[in-house]
């Protein structure tokens, strides 16, 4: 909003889920998807979504109750594992347990419900999602110390903004807004001190400042 309109308030936020995020992008309800959406070959090449610079590398993991006394997801034989049925998370979890020949009971959570809520109700022994989400959710639990994030990282999740194919000007704006934020952070420039760099003697910073 600041880059396009010069106004940080000129923005509207839409709440999306694992299914509606893509339909909203296709039908123009949203101009850019900034949810935790993994950059994959299928989404990019076959489904024609343009993934712009990765802003965060996450990895999928698991959380379980400390009282179970386990220290690894590989110890969860016969456990009930809940996960969202949409997105890459379900496939990653299935692949992990198949690879390690671990029998488990899948509890597939619908789009109208959250895995963490099903887990907290005691309907599953463990749930899996991106580790940043696990850490954030755990902080919101009534007794976070009673839950443990297991050490396994079962995937690599490159996350960043997504736009529709076909609008080169818009994708260029989003792409270079992200790059400018990267470069500015590397040089120690932020919204509070940017004016002090206007007459900087470094030619590289001079070019960056325009």
Model-predicted regions and their roles:
Residues 33-36, 41, 53, 110-113, ...:
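Terminal targeting/leader modules
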Residues 1, 17-21, 29, 33, ...:
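Stable alpha-helical elements in mature extracytoplasmic
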Residues 2-6, 26-30, 67, 81, ...:
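Sec-exported extracytoplasmic/periplasmic mature domains
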Residues 25-26, 76, 115-122, 161, ...:
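Hydrophobic residues within well-ordered alpha-helices
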Residues 43-47, 92-93, 116-118, 137-139, ...:
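Short, charged, surface-exposed secondary-structure boundary motifs
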Residues 1-5, 9, 38, 58-114:
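Bilobed "Venus flytrap"/periplasmic-binding protein-like clamshell domains
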Residues 1-4, 66-70, 74, 79-80, ...:
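Extended ligand-binding regions for polar small-molecule ligands
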